């Protein structure tokens, strides 16, 4: 395989245990190299057989991150975008399922000329071809590829073999491997143990790959003695053993790696000599705001269906960190399980005690819906800043229909197929869709904002583009009734047909959106809705003068025929 001219490749692998932070390492290295004036992109290769994570349970996979071009991808792509301030795409995430599907499709079309299709060479060649696509189609200096999984997993072997072959094809000056491992601290012995790292490197060597740089995660900083020992047993110079001890925030990782001179070692090994000194002044200022806010703290309640597994809301959590720094406050997040308000008769007032903002999170299915609706109602009636996202917007619409518009049977056809008052309904083009994978309304779409609304005030422009992931929408048959009762439709599709944003004008801050603003919040560009939401929570927390506000009493202006 020919290497795209001048593109250097870095492969990041992980060993010992999963969830060590390969994505954060890749994003941090990318940031350091970009700050030196290099053009960098990052891609993620996942070893599972699913074509994409779109149909996977949030409990198993965490958040599904959606790109501008509508790809449903791994949550690590969110880290790449937040750190590098560069958009990713479908090309940025490859699964083994997509590789096998492509190989099988080619076999069915006769492209292998009757040959026996095997992992070697056909699957490996497919992987190698895909590994170079992003480099071919982009103006890059460096392409970082994160290999998912842990060394020793059988699923990762084809990716590792492709990586081994590429190093032979490209040459050592054009490709290197960074291996992330764990150096556990044993409290009983008061000692860092290097044996797991040694065994992980041994397993990597069995695949024919000698790591060029080791990054060692640990609770405590690595001494020079430990680095020397690890290097001695893993065939590396001690300068190529990088320590990465625990940080208070993931945004401190690039600064720690800068101090460890990881970027300098990478540049030297790749033969890159012309580069500028990194300028991370903004990043340092951001980290200082995150760790040492000057205006106190706020508590935001996230009401969701998957709160037992916070990675399901990874981009939302990080967006709140960004918004907190933007408002000079520390954001404490209280994760609230939506079903608790249904199953245990939970007191919503008690659950939200001390909360300065309520966020009803995205999700699918009817589990926990009535609980979410109760939390929406409490936030609306008690003038607590509120943000609803995707399903959260739909729950806000249902709550408003029931408790303000007098539509007691209002619901979504997602939860009740024969709903008599469907304020949320399946989109017309979705009604004939049978397959689940990759068939939702996905990716970036334009939205027109209404002047004088909170949404327009936050964005400070009339045309925006946001990323979507949904099948259901607000039923336009009810728009007039909602408007008559005080709901403002502050954002719609350019043709005015699809409701994107709803808000209540006489509420402190009540905004709900059909799209996913969390996918576009970055360190360098905090999302305006999250910033506005946290600003309202900050004002609420600091006891600012409350707006003159009374909850809307049910007006019972029923649509003609709605009582039937």
Swiss-Prot record:
Residues 299-543 form the Glutamine amidotransferase type-1 domain. CTP binds at residues 18, 153-155, 193-198, 229. InterPro entries: Class_I_gatase-like (IPR029062), CTP_synthase (IPR004468), CTP_synthase_N (IPR017456), GATASE (IPR017926), GATase1_CTP_Synthase (IPR033828), P-loop_NTPase (IPR027417). It catalyses: UTP + L-glutamine + ATP + H2O = CTP + L-glutamate + ADP + phosphate + 2 H(+); L-glutamine + H2O = L-glutamate + NH4(+); UTP + NH4(+) + ATP = CTP + ADP + phosphate + 2 H(+). GO terms for biological process: 'de novo' CTP biosynthetic process; pyrimidine nucleobase biosynthetic process. Signal peptide: none annotated. Allosterically activated by GTP, when glutamine is the substrate; GTP has no effect on the reaction when ammonia is the substrate. The allosteric effector GTP functions by stabilizing the protein conformation that binds the tetrahedral intermediate(s) formed during glutamine hydrolysis. Inhibited by the product CTP, via allosteric rather than competitive inhibition. Pfam families: CTP_synth_N (PF06418), GATase (PF00117). UTP binds at residues 18, 193-198, 229. The active site is at residues 390, 516, 518. ATP binds at residues 19-24, 76. Pathway: Pyrimidine metabolism; CTP biosynthesis via de novo pathway; CTP from UDP: step 2/2. Residues 1-272 are annotated as: Amidoligase domain. One of its GO terms (cellular component) is cytosol. GO terms for molecular function: ATP binding; CTP synthase activity; glutaminase activity; identical protein binding; metal ion binding. Its EC number is 6.3.4.2. Keywords: ATP-binding, Glutamine amidotransferase, Ligase, Magnesium, Metal-binding, Nucleotide-binding, Pyrimidine biosynthesis. L-glutamine binds at residues 59, 363, 391-394, 414, 471. CTPSs have evolved a hybrid strategy for distinguishing between UTP and CTP. The overlapping regions of the product feedback inhibitory and substrate sites recognize a common feature in both compounds, the triphosphate moiety. To differentiate isosteric substrate and product pyrimidine rings, an additional pocket far from the expected kinase/ligase catalytic site, specifically recognizes the cytosine and ribose portions of the product inhibitor. Belongs to the CTP synthase family. Catalyzes the ATP-dependent amination of UTP to CTP with either L-glutamine or ammonia as the source of nitrogen. Regulates intracellular CTP levels through interactions with the four ribonucleotide triphosphates. NCBIfam families: PRK05380.1, PyrG. Homotetramer. This is CTP synthase. It comes from Prosthecochloris aestuarii (strain DSM 271 / SK 413). The gene is pyrG.
């Amino acid at each position: 395989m020919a290497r795209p001219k001048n593109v250097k490749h870095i492969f990041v692998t992980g060993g010992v245990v999963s969830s060590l932070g390969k994505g954060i390492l890749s994003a941090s290295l990318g940031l350091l190299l970009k700050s030196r004036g290099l053009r960098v992109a990052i891609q993620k290769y996942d070893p599972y057989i699913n074509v994409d994570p779109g149909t996977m349970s949030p409990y198993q996979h965490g958040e599904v991150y959606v790109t501008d071009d509508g790809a449903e991808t791994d949550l690590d792509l969110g880290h790449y975008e937040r750190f590098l301030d560069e958009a990713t795409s479908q090309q940025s995430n490859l699964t083994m399922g997509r590789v096998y599907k492509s190989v099988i499709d080619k076999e069915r079309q006769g492209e292998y000329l009757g040959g026996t299709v095997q992992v070697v060479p056909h699957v490996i060649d497919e992987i190698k071809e895909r590994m170079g696509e992003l480099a071919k189609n982009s103006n890059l200096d460096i392409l970082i590829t994160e290999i998912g999984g842990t060394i020793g997993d059988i699923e990762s072997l084809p990716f590792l073999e492709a990586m081994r072959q590429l190093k032979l094809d490209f040459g050592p000056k054009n490709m290197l491997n960074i291996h992330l491992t764990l150096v556990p601290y044993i409290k009983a012995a008061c000692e860092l143990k290097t044996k797991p790292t040694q065994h992980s490197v041994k397993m990597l060597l069995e695949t024919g790959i000698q790591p060029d740089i080791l990054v060692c995660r640990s609770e405590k900083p690595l001494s020079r003695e430990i680095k020397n020992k690890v290097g001695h047993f893993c065939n590396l110079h001690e300068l190529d053993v990088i320590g990465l001890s625990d940080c208070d925030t993931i945004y401190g990782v690039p600064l720690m790696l800068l101090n460890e001179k990881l970027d300098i070692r990478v540049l030297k090994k790749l033969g890159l000599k012309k580069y500028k000194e990194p300028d991370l002044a903004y990043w340092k200022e951001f980290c200082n705001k995150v760790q040492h806010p000057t205006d106190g703290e706020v508590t935001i309640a996230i009401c969701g269906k998957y709160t037992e597994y916070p990675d399901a809301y990874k981009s939302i959590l990080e967006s709140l960190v960004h918004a907190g720094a933007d408002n000079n406050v520390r954001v404490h997040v209280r994760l609230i399980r939506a079903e608790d308000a249904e199953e245990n008769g939970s007191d919503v007032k008690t659950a939200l005690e001390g909360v300065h903002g309520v966020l009803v999170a995205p999700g699918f299915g009817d589990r926990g819906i009535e609980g979410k609706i109760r939390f929406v109602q409490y936030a609306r009636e008690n003038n607590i800043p509120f943000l609803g996202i995707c399903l959260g917007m739909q729950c806000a619409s249902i709550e408003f229909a029931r408790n303000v518009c007098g539509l007691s049977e209002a619901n979504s056809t997602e939860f009740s197929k024969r709903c008599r008052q469907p304020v949320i309904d399946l989109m017309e083009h979705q009604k004939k869709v049978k397959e689940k994978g990759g068939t939702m309304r996905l990716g970036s779409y334009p939205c027109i904002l209404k002047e004088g609304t909170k949404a327009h005030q936050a964005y400070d422009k009339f045309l925006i583009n946001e990323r979507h992931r949904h099948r259901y929408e607000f039923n336009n048959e009810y728009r007039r009734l909602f408007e008559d009762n005080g709901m403002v439709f502050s954002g719609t599709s350019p043709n005015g047909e699809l409701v994107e944003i709803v808000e209540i004008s006489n509420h402190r801050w009540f905004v709900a959106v059909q799209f996913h603003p969390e996918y576009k919040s970055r360190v360098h560009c905090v999302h305006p809705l999250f910033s506005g939401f946290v600003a309202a929570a900050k004002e609420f927390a600091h006891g600012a003068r409350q707006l003159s506000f009374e909850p809307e009493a049910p007006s019972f202006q029923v649509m003609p025929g709605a009582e039937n």
